[in-house]
Swiss-Prot record:
This is Phosphatidylinositol 4-kinase beta. Belongs to the PI3/PI4-kinase family. Type III PI4K subfamily. The keyword Kinase applies. Its cofactor is Mg(2+); Mn(2+).
């Protein structure tokens, strides 16, 4: 594709009022667009007309191919990207206001002409009010999404599409599910407004491209199969997965392939497309993955990728840039599906370790972990550290991933492979050479998988057989003598102001720490994850780094991820967005509530990845391992009632409990057993697993009827019903609800947009959004809200259904 120019927004005048974002067509336009802007005087129609003429002049410049600011300088987007003849983003809104024709048809009386001029002046005034709102500092990404969803004016929608370029990338990324869902399920005007931004960002970021491709596939899956195949979402997804959106200034990277060893495998069964980073390994696979694009027969069969791949020597095609990452993800998902077929937890764990050991032979490669927030290459998976998590029917598992951070994923060389048995010397870090490979050696170790889709067939991978590996000496410059230095030397020693502490305080704190060192869990074959999750994160990082052949590198990082197969994480993603929005609201309103949103990657309608919460174990694991009440466990971990550590942990518990109680009430979160509530090392509780929210409940049993889960054990940790911390808890609940309802629209629109075209169980019934709005109690006074909070706390604490559900989980799943 060539350079892209975003057409200016077209704001068409109409004789009818512009619909408000809230959808109240009967209300005054001015009351909607000036809400929250402050006092704005009613402008004279002539002034409005003059302002419109100025905008028209800018539009004429825009159509002439000139994009300049009011100061005459080339424009730069707010997100830091230059215009570079692709994106035109004016300092003032690039809005085109089309005036009605001045010439009247023959026979029209002069009174009609006057009426037309009057309507034109009124429309111009209304458009000026809208422009003033769009130009104001109060116009943020949340308002832009609201107008894009609610407005029926193509001109307004096109203008908002242009304005997306002027917001920060991370602000727009938060609403990516909403943007793509609107693109798939709403009318063409909305789709046309959104597409230029999506295409532009896909050219910039490979991770953004992956996120878009995965979400487009997942949100299109609710459509009928015949409609889905020809939908706009499917077409955009194919465009993203092709090479057409690869940055134009980057040359196509040609894979460096070594002759395959004579293993007796047919070409269709060679699944490992090798780069020089691992070309020294002689690999024999008895697997049966999908045919890769390196097979010339497949190139003619595959509809999705044939148009975007180029033939090389009539035998090989250059892999599209997302292909290695897609196969990496596919491999992780296939492991989860195979684990689910095994009967015992111990067998699953052993199989998981073996599978990941095989996966390591394909690393390093040009792949990354999408849940991370920085550019990196995956170099190794410490397979012995992986654990299978608790699940009755499925086999979610937790892995740790070693990565090397880099400045730019696309342009940085893939790190050279270092064998596990490489002996490292004790030379100083100054003698550390750059361990990399040449530009020609950067082809990913994962082969292209054309038939990658959301159906079960595309995910299926036959069991991998034995893998025989020979490791001759690897030529990696002078990396044989890489120095080994301590983790302490890697930690940056930033200069800090001296802090003076009394010797008595130091002795007291040291004695408290020695007396109350956090306990370690015992290994349980039925729950192997408990020990792994209980280990402090920094200790785990140190231990894995010491045993890693890449641990000596200063840009080495350790990440973790939970891989889930057979679960629809689209509701989890929706819950993450709501939690993130509430967290931002409470920070803005300075309410000290604490919640921990964790990242979600939706891969398909039944698979995904989750960012683990570090230094946290479930309350079920706490009770099972310690055989103590929650309060006694706090005393064991943090010291007696009067210690600083206990008081700090108690405050953290109260602030997090209040935050999650409000979340559970607003979203109607169900399935709140102790396996889905974590407790971290600082005393916070963290709710996980938001698979049942809003209109859905487990098996539609309707067990949990209370507003949220508040057990007597929770109250005991707070100091009892008459304690100050319990009163503090109720005060936080009230403050949090008051703050949340001030920003109700920001929360509701996240949910409302995702309901469009969705078949998710959380949206069953026609009253989901109405009930959500009612839970904000906009009509209540603060005194009435205080009474409501008291009633909800009392009702939840005395709820018999909470006790029944906990008993049900204990009897059926053994959850304490």
């Amino acid at each position: 594709m060539g350079d892209m120019v975003v057409e200016p927004a077209t704001l068409k005048p109409t004789s009818e009022p512009t619909p408000s974002p809230s959808g109240n067509n009967g209300g005054s336009l001015l009351s909607v667009i000036t809400e929250g802007v402050g006092e704005l005087s009613v402008i004279d129609p002539e002034v409005a007309q003059k302002a419109c003429q100025e905008v028209l002049e800018k539009v004429k410049l825009l159509h002439g191919g000139v994009a300049i600011s009011s100061k005459g300088s080339p424009l730069e987007l707010v997100n830091g990207d230059g215009v570079d003849n692709e994106i035109r983003c004016l300092d003032d809104p690039p809005t085109e206001i089309r005036e009605e024709e001045d010439e009247m048809e023959p026979g029209v009386v002069s009174g009609t002409a006057k009426g037309t001029r009057r309507r034109r002046q009124n429309n111009s005034a209304k458009q000026s009010w809208l422009l003033r709102l769009f130009e104001s500092k109060l116009f943020d990404i949340s308002m832009a999404i609201s107008y894009l969803y609610n407005s029926k004016e193509p001109g307004v929608q096109a203008y908002i599409g242009n304005r997306l370029f002027c917001f920060r990338n991370e602000d727009v990324d938060f609403y990516l599910p909403q943007l793509l869902n609107m693109y798939i399920h709403m009318d063409e005007d909305v789709g046309d407004a959104i597409k230029p931004y999506i295409v532009h960002r896909c050219r910039q970021s490979i991770n953004f491209s992956l996120q878009c491709a995965l979400l487009l596939g997942a949100y299109s899956s609710d459509m009928h199969i015949s409609t889905q195949r020809h939908s706009r979402g499917t077409k955009l997804r194919k465009l993203i997965l092709s090479d057409e959106l690869k940055p134009a200034h980057r040359k196509r990277e040609l894979p460096t392939l070594s002759p395959a060893p004579d293993t007796g495998l047919s070409p269709s069964k060679r699944t490992h497309q090798r780069s020089k980073s691992d070309a020294t390994a002689s690999i024999s696979l008895s697997s049966n993955l999908k045919r890769t694009a390196s097979n010339p027969k497949v190139e003619n069969e595959d509809e999705e990728l044939s148009s975007s791949t180029e033939s090389i020597d009539n035998s090989f095609s250059s892999p599209v840039r997302l292909a290695p990452e897609r196969e990496f993800i596919k491999s992780l998902m296939a492991i989860g599906k195979r684990l689910a077929t095994l009967p015992t937890k111990e067998q699953k764990t052993q199989r998981l370790i073996s599978e990941l050991s095989l996966l390591n032979h394909k690393l390093p490669a040009r792949v990354w972990l999408p849940t991370a927030g920085f550019d990196h290459h995956v170099v190794r998976v410490p397979h012995t550290q992986a654990v299978v998590l608790n699940s009755k029917d499925k086999a979610p598992y937790l892995i740790y991933v070693e990565v090397l951070e880099c400045e730019n994923f696309d342009t940085t060389n893939v790190p050279a492979r270092i064998p596990e048995n490489r002996i490292r010397s004790t030379r100083s870090v100054e003698n550390l050479p750059e361990c990399g490979i040449t530009h020609e050696q950067r082809a990913g170790s994962f082969s292209t998988v054309p038939n990658y889709d959301n159906d079960d067939e595309a995910w299926s991978v036959d069991d991998i057989g034995e893998l025989q590996v020979e490791l001759p000496e690897v030529h990696t410059n002078s990396c044989d003598n890489i120095s080994q230095f301590s983790v302490d030397s890697i930690t940056s020693q930033e200069s800090k102001e001296p802090v003076f502490i009394a010797a008595g305080d130091i002795r007291r704190r040291l004695s408290e720490q020695l007396a109350h060192t956090p306990t370690a869990f015992k290994r349980d074959p039925e729950d192997p994850s408990a020990v792994a999750l209980k280990e402090p994160w920094q200790e785990k990082v140190r231990r894995i780094r010491e045993g890693s052949p890449y641990g000596h590198l200063p840009n080495w990082r350790l990440l973790s991820v939970i891989v889930k197969c057979g679960d629809d994480l689209r509701q989890e993603l929706l819950a993450f967005q709501v939690l993130k929005q509430l967290q931002s609201i409470w920070e803005q309103e300075r309410v000290p509530l604490w919640i921990k949103p964790y990242k979600i990657l939706v891969i398909s309608a039944d698979s995904g990845m989750i960012e683990p919460v570090v230094n946290a174990v479930s309350i079920h694991q706490v009770k099972k391992q310690s055989q103590l009440s929650l309060l006694d466990y706090f005393l064991q971990e943090h010291g007696s009632y009067t210690t600083e550590a206990f008081l700090s942990a108690q405050r953290n518990f109260v602030q997090s409990c209040a935050g999650y109680c409000l979340v559970c009430y607003l979203l109607q979160v169900k399935d709140r057993h102790n396996g889905n509530i974590l407790l971290d090392a600082e005393g916070h509780i963290i709710h996980i697993d938001f698979g049942f929210i809003l209109s859905s409940s487990p098996r539609n049993l309707g067990f949990e009827t209370s507003a949220f889960k508040l057990t007597t054990e929770f109250v005991d940790v707070m100091g009892g019903l008459n304690g100050d911390m319990f009163n503090y808890y109720k005060m936080l609940m009230l403050q949090g609800l008051i703050a949340a309802r001030k920003h109700m629209d920001k929360v509701v629109q996240i949910v409302e947009i995702m309901q469009q075209g969705s078949q998710l169980p959380c949206f069953h019934g026609s009253s989901t959004i109405r009930n959500l709005k009612e839970r904000f109690h906009m009509s209540m006074t603060e005194e009435q809200l205080q009474l409501l909070v008291e009633q909800m706390v009392d009702g939840s604490m005395r709820s018999i259904t909470t006790k029944l559900y906990d008993g049900f989980q204990y009897l059926t799943n053994g959850i304490m």
